[in-house]
Amino acid sequence: DMEKLAVKIRPGADAQGKNPVEEVRRYNRELKKIRSFIRSRPVKNDFEILFLENFEKMYRTADDILARMETSGCRKLFEESVSKGSVVHGDYNYHNLIMLRDDIAVTDFEHMHTDIQIKDFCYFLRKAMEKNQWKQKILEAYEEVRPLSEREKEFAALSLAYPGKFKKIAGSYYRSNKAHLSEKNVEKLQICIRQTEEKYEFLSRIFPLNL
């Protein structure tokens, strides 16, 4: 149970997570950089057209989340988590879980570091819900084991609301060979856009985000 570990990690390279406010600020810069690149292309393919059609809405959300993070308790929560040595797995998803008869084993701890512990849950929830729809029961089950503070709920809401999948797919395309566009890339972006609406509907039911 990562949430109950009382392990202190020795300071060193990659032993500490990133400040979430600065991380989102960097993500937003990357999104604008990708848009500038795509805009500059004289002939745009299907992926680029779809990206530009949805960029403004996605970026407004990303920018709004950054503004809220800057005035929220996220920065303080991060500093306190690092100071007290709160541990996260760093790659907590179903690939690293082994179902036993009466328990669950967690594997692959090479990304473990100090950070906001709720990040593990946010990462797992995002991965699981993208494949199984967004359902409130998983959050309720988590809080039965480990109730969240108001600051943690605020961070979880903002973290989950950020259009990270949109940025990830766009970034992957930006770094790829543009001469060989795969239909799979377009399909991934289409699914991401559809799931983003489902995600916001889910979040609006449990967090006062008003996105």
Give the label of every model feature segment:
Residues 10-87:
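ATP-dependent phospho-/nucleotidyl transfer catalytic cores
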Residues 167-211:
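ATP/Mg2+ or Mg2+-diphosphate-binding catalytic cores
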Residues 1-11:
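Internal "kinase-insert"/substrate-recognition segments embedded within catalytic cores
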Residues 114-149, 160-181:
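Active-site activation/catalytic loop segments of kinase-like enzymes and analogous catalytic loops
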Residues 2, 67-117:
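Active-site acidic catalytic loop and adjacent metal/ATP-binding pocket
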